[in-house]
């Protein structure tokens, strides 16, 4: 799904003189999350795939822009009834996504609280991270 759609968009924009590919991944791609290993690995793959396509477009001089949108927890039916930290309302998230695309941001971590969280997550060494009881509920 993700690879086919993103690659199709890349080839379409390559053939038509440029464009902007925006994908929604997640902050879960920042670190391996023991509470959701497959999910965090998939999101990390998406981050890396977009980064690689962006580099390819630049090397080949294709005028294709990319925005990797990385929200945290968004209040949707999928999360209904659960207790999730820093839950964001969907309309607010949608407005921030539109703003990130309009500003041509390469990576957009949605919401300042999550930007701070991601910043600190990246500072945690692997030996310590694997000992932390990170939960998503």
Which ranges hold each PLM region?
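A short helix-coil junction within the Rossmann-fold of NAD(P)-dependent oxidoreductases
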Residues: 8-17
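Active-site helix of classical SDR
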Residues: 6, 42
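Conserved SDR Rossmann-fold cofactor-binding beta-strand/turn motif
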Residues: 65-71, 75
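Active-site-adjacent segment of SDR/Rossmann-fold oxidoreductases
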Residues: 31, 52-64
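Residue(s) in the substrate-gating loop at a strand-loop-helix junction
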Residues: 26
């Amino acid at each position: 799904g993700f690879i086919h759609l993103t690659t199709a968009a890349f080839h379409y924009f390559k053939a038509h003189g440029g464009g902007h590919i925006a994908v929604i991944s997640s902050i879960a791609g920042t670190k391996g999350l023991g509470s959701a290993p497959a999910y965090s690995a998939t999101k990390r793959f998406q981050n890396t795939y977009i980064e690689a396509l962006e580099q390819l477009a630049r090397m080949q001089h294709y005028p294709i822009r990319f925005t990797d949108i990385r929200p945290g927890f968004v209040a949707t039916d999928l999360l209904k009834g659960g207790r999730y930290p820093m839950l964001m309302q969907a309309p607010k998230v949608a407005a921030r996504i539109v703003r990130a695309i309009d500003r041509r941001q390469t990576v957009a971590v949605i919401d300042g609280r999550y930007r701070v969280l991601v910043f600190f997550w990246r500072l945690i060494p692997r030996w310590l991270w694997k000992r932390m009881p990170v939960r998503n509920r």
